[in-house]
């Protein structure tokens, strides 16, 4: 700059001094400028004041020469000091050139700019608040300055500005929040520290309600919470803690819905502190906001469910997640099963996409997880000024989204045991609270629920059975026409069973056991489908039948009607084409029937056959039990049909006696010695009235080889008393015994013919397999 150039009212000496490289000379020039401006102020000469500021700005502060810029900065500061309380009229002209120097490449010049702005702000105090955003923007950049002197200077200016904001009641929070939202996504540690420090200050000012704008900055706060610096993490943790305290104090004014998806995202963070903090917030939101959170249920479950399988290393997160899960579950009521006439209001309807609306976060952060599809996945920054009364608007349950999340967790092989248990608890809860809506999803859920029966955990299987039992017994699942197994959705397992024809039971005296599965008020159209598909699963997974079959059926007998289960399975097995499986399944069912404490009442019902219903059940079981000869005999023992048992054993001579057959006879002998057949053993005392029982037992004895079972049964039969010893009291006993009523005549001849027919089928199939095996062997030899 030409020092001789006319820059009046600045004198040539002042101009030369301002351009000097020596700081002391520039300082002297600044004092002269201060005197000059004071004189103009006393004269109220605003034109000259503006002219001086313009010269210092254009000719010095914005000059290409570094020393001139330094002179301009100190000159502008001198003007501000001279103006005093009147500096507010000229703040824009004073501040803008100084802020421009914040971007200077020379660190010394940036330091002088800090110093100049400090003096300007110190004089103006509250008058600078209308320019707060530009000051904050400049300071946020200097907070990350690599030069320690510049950073130190910016910190002094920062403290001064915070004091001014704290003292003032005219802070423009509405205008400041967009800038704060933008700057909060900085990745620089110093910039983050600067942002958090300002949030803490604003939180502490009583007249500033930052809580209203929390949805705008909450995501950024959680981003900062993951910073590598412990100090910054601690500051952010304190800030979030203060916000949460305010939320608890004033829940009615909190915009819970606008922050729900932010929490959902951060509840899935891989950073433990972020996840624990977000989960803690979610817990409080669920308890404070209640049903306002229902539209976000699927997203919440997406975040919470995996945490339930955490080990002790993340015990805190697991415990909080469990509370969140329980709280969310309690929000669902039977009213949610009503018609969908009440729609979500626009205020509570979640938006379509979080990332598209969050204009700033999309530039600064990438989320590794995706939320479930609409409507549980959004935040709309446009609603920041919406009234808090939005939280009281009616909400509806998005059951489709919830079921989608639950179904996905059941399908994923990596899902932990506790999570699977919780998913099944959720399904059971939904079938209890919202059965009508849940049955819309039953066809899609049925296959995975059946597959879950193969889970390694007994507890998972128990919960799965509870869900299946509720599906099979809920009145909401009853349809006008019983759904045939051939109508199941694609991919649903089914047995190859002919459609059972509905036979109207004749009023005659002979009972036929070929009717379809029972239809009772407690069973719906899904019950028969469940039985068909359960047997199909046992057929395809013999290991499941072997290891868990008895456990599953026994639990079902506790959850459902045992008679219906056995009646239905017997009816299905009667039409089973895989005869080997049918025999194995009958053997398992028979063992359960005879040994399980859960079936005590059913055994008592079959033991006496005193009602037409019990006789009908016996006939139904008998026809399927014919797939397994020894099981058929044991059923006759249970029902005290000793003569028919003897007749069956007589037919055993025509059967193919295998090792498996003899093993089953051995097990039956062992079973006769158990408490279940105590009544049978006592009946051996009444020799004359139970001759066929003794004959049947001797028949079993003759079938057995010389083994431990043979010795056991032989010793038992040796204890049978001599009929002659029992004869003296026989007449008296016979006269006192009332004749046993026969509630319905059972055609035992027809049943025996059915037994022969079924066993002939088994023999034919075995011969076919044997012949095919021999033919294959001959071909291999040739």
Swiss-Prot record:
Q: Does the keyword Endoplasmic reticulum apply?
A: yes
Which SUPFAM superfamilies does its entry note?
A: ARM repeat
Localization? Endosome membrane; Microsome membrane
Q: Where are the HEAT repeats?
A: 5-42, 89-126, 171-208, 212-249, 440-477, 560-598
| Compositional bias of kind Polar residues | 357-375
Q: Which InterPro entries match?
A: ARM-like (IPR011989), ARM-type_fold (IPR016024), Vac14 (IPR026825), VAC14_Fig4p-bd (IPR021841)
Could you confirm whether the keyword Membrane appears in this record? yes
GO CC terms in record = endoplasmic reticulum; endosome membrane; PAS complex
State the UniProt keywords alphabetically. Endoplasmic reticulum, Endosome, Membrane, Microsome, Repeat
A Gene Ontology biological process noted in the UniProt record is: phosphatidylinositol biosynthetic process
**Alphabetized Pfam families for the sequence:** Vac14_Fab1_bd, Vac14_Fig4_bd
Sequence segments annotated as region (Disordered): 334-375
- Highest rank taxon of the organism: Eukaryota
Q: How does it associate, per the subunit comment? A: Forms pentamers. Component of the PI(3,5)P2 regulatory complex/PAS complex, at least composed of PIKFYVE, FIG4 and VAC14. VAC14 nucleates the assembly of the complex and serves as a scaffold by pentamerizing into a star-shaped structure, which can bind a single copy each of PIKFYVE and FIG4 and coordinates their activities. Interacts with NOS1.
Instruction: Tell me the function of this protein.
Output: Scaffold protein component of the PI(3,5)P2 regulatory complex which regulates both the synthesis and turnover of phosphatidylinositol 3,5-bisphosphate (PtdIns(3,5)P2). Pentamerizes into a star-shaped structure and nucleates the assembly of the complex. The pentamer binds a single copy each of PIKFYVE and FIG4 and coordinates both PIKfyve kinase activity and FIG4 phosphatase activity, being required to maintain normal levels of phosphatidylinositol 3-phosphate (PtdIns(3)P) and phosphatidylinositol 5-phosphate (PtdIns(5)P).
Domain observations: The C-terminal domain (residues 523-782) mediates pentameric interactions and is necessary for the formation and maintenance of the PI(3,5)P2 regulatory complex.
As for family, the record states: Belongs to the VAC14 family.
Instruction: From the Swiss-Prot or TrEMBL record, give the protein name.
Output: Protein VAC14 homolog
**Which organism is the protein's source?**
Xenopus laevis
